[in-house]
Amino acid sequence: MPKKDGAIEIEGRVIEPLPNAMFRVELANGHKVLAHISGKMRQHYIRILPEDRVVVELSPYDLTRGRIVYRYK
């Protein structure tokens, strides 16, 4: 599936789950962002737990928020 134009994909690690399917994720470069689960992951009931490695898609307009698009097995 093609990624959105201008979106930045970066690997990270889930630090803590938050209410409403939000997660605090520490990126590979050390920054911490607030991320929610993408619709397809929610649709297929993919569970995300603390310490999971994930791929986060960031918007170039707001680098403090992102969308989790993949969870490594």
UniProtKB/Swiss-Prot annotation:
Chief location bin: cytoplasm
InterPro entries, per database record: NA-bd_OB-fold (IPR012340), RNA-binding_domain_S1_IF1 (IPR006196), TIF_IF1 (IPR004368)
PROSITE patterns the UniProt entry points to: S1_IF1_TYPE
GO molecular function, one term: rRNA binding
Pfam assignment, any one: eIF-1a
Sorted UniProt keywords: Cytoplasm, Initiation factor, Protein biosynthesis, RNA-binding, rRNA-binding
Ranges for domain S1-like: 1-73
One cellular component (GO) term of this entry: cytosol
Record localization: Cytoplasm
PANTHER family: TRANSLATION INITIATION FACTOR IF-1, CHLOROPLASTIC
Family listed: Belongs to the IF-1 family.
Subunit structure: Component of the 30S ribosomal translation pre-initiation complex which assembles on the 30S ribosome in the order IF-2 and IF-3, IF-1 and N-formylmethionyl-tRNA(fMet); mRNA recruitment can occur at any time during PIC assembly.
Described function: One of the essential components for the initiation of protein synthesis. Stabilizes the binding of IF-2 and IF-3 on the 30S subunit to which N-formylmethionyl-tRNA(fMet) subsequently binds. Helps modulate mRNA selection, yielding the 30S pre-initiation complex (PIC). Upon addition of the 50S ribosomal subunit IF-1, IF-2 and IF-3 are released leaving the mature 70S translation initiation complex.
Protein name: Translation initiation factor IF-1
